Structure formats: structure tokens, C-alpha cells
Amino acid sequence: MNKRLYTIFLISVFLLLPGFSTAAERIYNVLFVQSYAPETPWHNDLVRGLKDGFGESGLKVNITTEFLDANFWTYQSEKLIMRRFCERARERGTDLIVTVSDEAFHTLLTCGDSLALQLPVVFFNIKYPEGSLIDSLPNVCVDIRRIPISENY
């Protein structure tokens, strides 16, 4: 994947979290929610890019990846699953939530769990951003550029 996209993504994280980049001795817990199943070919590249980007910035992170599997579940089931993701993230002491694609974005913000309102949240690869929803949440940073997955696979 394009390293420049990951660098820009990480810069947006740093703009959202002043001082986040200066505390390299701390280990941050990151919840990475992907919209589809782990068998989707590009998901390993996304995880690797996220890890590499934090590593290049000198940050120590524990990344927990959860898969929403949105092609399988109904919307109501997705919201229940997302609440479980949030519950586990809360138990781990998660510091940042990152999601990829529309399903994870929308489900996180509408599942009814307050974690998405309490932590910094970064979304990327959104095809249909909901401007009013994004604008109403000061803790949300969205990169609406599309990652050209078809060029890489």
C-alpha cells in the first residue's frame, strides 16, 4: 500500500491528539475495526501499514483488530457486535479507535455505546461520509480519500 497515505493518516491522528507523539515511552492501545472479514486480501496490508506508521513515528502501540463482517450480518446484528467490540476495548483501556470503510464508521457511531464519544476516533476509506454526523463529534477525524485497493490487487 502507499506509505504516503499511511503517513498522512498518522499526521491526522497527531493533529487530533496533541502530545500523543511526544510520549513514546507509553504503550498505547488501539482498536482497529475493519468492516469485512479477515479473509479479505487487503486487510493484512492495512494492519501492517498501521503498525508500520506508528512504529516509524516512534510510538509503541498494541493494536487489536476486530472484524465486523458486514457482508454477513444484518445492521441490527452489526450494532450488537460493535457494542461488544467497545466493551472489550473499554476493558483493555483503549486509547484510540481506528476504523476502515463505511460500515465500521457508521456502525460505531450509531451502535449506542458511548466509547466512540469518549475516545479519539479516526476513520478512513469512507465512500459516503455523513457530514452532519462527523461535524457533531469533535473527537472524530476522518480521511475521506479512497485508498486505491484495486490498483494493488
Language model features: what each stretch is:
Residues 2-5, 20-153:
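Short hydrophobic alpha-helices and adjacent helix-cap/hinge residues
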